[in-house]
C-alpha cells in the first residue's frame, strides 16, 4: 500500500513544482507524469477530477507548506523584526536555489485559475 501513497505524493509534488515554474495552464498532465515518473493511469486513479483536482491539491499542499514555514519562523523569532527578516531571507533563498525559476507556490496557480 505504501507504493500507492508514494505515487500520489510524487505526482502531487511534481505538479506543485511544475505549476510554480510553468504556471497552471502552461503545465500539461503528461509533464506532471514525466516529472513524477508515474504511469498515466495513476494520475486519474489518485486525481479522478483531472487537472483541476490536482491543481486544487497542489494549492492546498503549497498553502500548508507556506503556513508551516511561517509558523516555525514565528515560533523561533524573538521579535517581529526578526520574524519578518527571516521570512524575507527564506523567500530569497528559495528563489536563488531555484535559479529564479520557482514562482510563488500559491499565486502562480491561483491567479491563473481565479476567473474559472
At which residue positions do the language-model features occur?
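Short, intrinsically disordered, charge-balanced linker/junction segments flanking boundaries
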Residues: 113-116
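Short, basic, alpha-helical segments at the C-terminal edge of helix-turn-helix-like DNA-binding modules
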Residues: 60-65
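A generic short alpha-helical patch detector that favors 3-5-residue windows
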Residues: 7, 31, 98-102
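Hydrophobic alpha-helical connector segments
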Residues: 70-102
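N-terminal intrinsically disordered/low-complexity leader segments
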Residues: 1-6, 77
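Helix-turn-helix
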Residues: 10, 14-57
